[in-house]
Amino acid sequence: SDYSIWKYLEGTKEASDPSTAWRALDFDDARWREGQSGFSIGFGNYDAPTRLWGMPRVYPSLFLRKKFTLEDTGWIQSLVMRVDYDDGFVAYLNGTEVARRGLAGEPDQPVPFDAPAAVHSRGNPELIDLAPYKLLLEAGENILTVQAHNSTVLSSWFAFHVELLANVVRGPFISATT
């Protein structure tokens, strides 16, 4: 849903060792915090549900995890990630990189927790077509993980909100006539 509960970890260091382990479905995130989707420092005009008051001058990034269950993936026609962000992010679906904005590197190249993002202002959500990645989805449990970054640890502007949207089509349907 639009404002579902996510697990998150403040980016004061790498989220795991090795640095990519946190992206896995079976990663133990029991010590991570929980917050409603829509994360921000709380300054400016973005009234996000989860406020990160301690972020400025302390940590430059945020690690996010959201598990979700699908009964059947065969009916999914389209898959779109709607994301509004300030400043950059990398998103992974079931451990595979599916989108990167404002952060240097090649696909699936790990991004250090303290990497600066290019400056980008929120307010114009981007729709990213993930149809090429819908085969990554499995019947049962799946996970969307995101590493969201600020432009600098000193910046007092940070915001991140994401939704994964699927168009499900069932049919064709045949009705019996009497």
For each feature predicted by the language model, list its residue ranges.
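Aromatic-lined ligand-binding clefts that engage carbohydrates, nucleic acids, or primary amines
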Residues: 6, 32, 60, 68, ...
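Surface-exposed, low-complexity/disordered Ser/Thr/Gly/Pro/Asn-rich loops and linkers
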Residues: 25-65
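Boundary/junction segments of secreted and surface-exposed precursor proteins
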Residues: 1-13, 168-178
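Short edge-strand/loop segments of extracellular domains
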Residues: 84-89, 96-98, 162-171
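An acidic-aromatic loop/edge-strand motif
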Residues: 104, 114-178
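Extracellular and analogous surface-interaction loops
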Residues: 65-75, 132-136
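Extracellular/periplasmic catalytic domains that process cell-envelope and extracellular macromolecules
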Residues: 1, 74, 84, 136-139
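Acidic glycine-/aspartate-rich tracts in secreted/extracellular proteins
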Residues: 9-16, 26, 38-40, 72-74, ...
